[in-house]
């Protein structure tokens, strides 16, 4: 057993444990030393004086672009000079008719007229019938009318709820005796022996012995 005496060789190591959690990131390292100076550059391949390049042929003008968005409204302009006085307007149409005026004073009575001529003598002619008079009082009720014909039978009503079960009826009469059944199959042979011998043998009817 480990921990007792000096017995290190008798104890074997166990299985490796699960991997531990990753450690915290380390501190940033110190800045490195400055590098050595670089090699001198190569001599230029092109000549010192640049060769003039002829200008390119101007390209044809492209198609006009789509119209741009409407710009914001400009600042208000300065007020203009006062205009010249206008001409007189033509007369307007006649206005609507006014309300009627108050009634005038009564005139002076006229002179008396001449007496009228006598009416010619004519026979009496009955005038047109006058308007109908007011409704009279309600009369007494008339006699009863004849009885009407019997109406057609109405539609059958909906099925009512199920009633309670009635009392059980009296037992019925006993039925007639049934027909006699078919004869049964012949019975099996009996198990009793037919006779027994002196030596202990047992003989049956089917010829077997035990």
UniProtKB/Swiss-Prot annotation:
Misc. remarks from the entry: This protein shows 4 potential triple-helical regions, which contain glycine as every third amino acid.
Q: Which InterPro entries match?
A: Collagen
Q: What is this protein called?
A: Cuticle collagen 2C
- What lineage is on file? Eukaryota, Metazoa, Ecdysozoa, Nematoda, Chromadorea
- Which keywords fit this entry according to its UniProt record? Collagen, Cuticle, Repeat
Lineage top rank: taxon = Eukaryota
Instruction: Tell me the organism.
Output: Haemonchus contortus (Barber pole worm)
Family classification: Belongs to the cuticular collagen family.
This chain is encoded by the gene named 2C
Q: Name the residue ranges with Pro residues bias.
A: 40-76, 88-103, 123-144
Question: For bias kind Low complexity, which ranges apply?
Answer: 105-122, 167-179
> Which is one Gene Ontology cellular component term of this protein?
collagen trimer
The entry lists its GO molecular-function terms as:
structural constituent of cuticle
Briefly, what is this protein's role? Answer: Nematode cuticles are composed largely of collagen-like proteins. The cuticle functions both as an exoskeleton and as a barrier to protect the worm from its environment.
Q: Looking at the keywords, is Protein biosynthesis present?
A: no
Instruction: Give the residue ranges for region: Disordered.
Output: 11-210
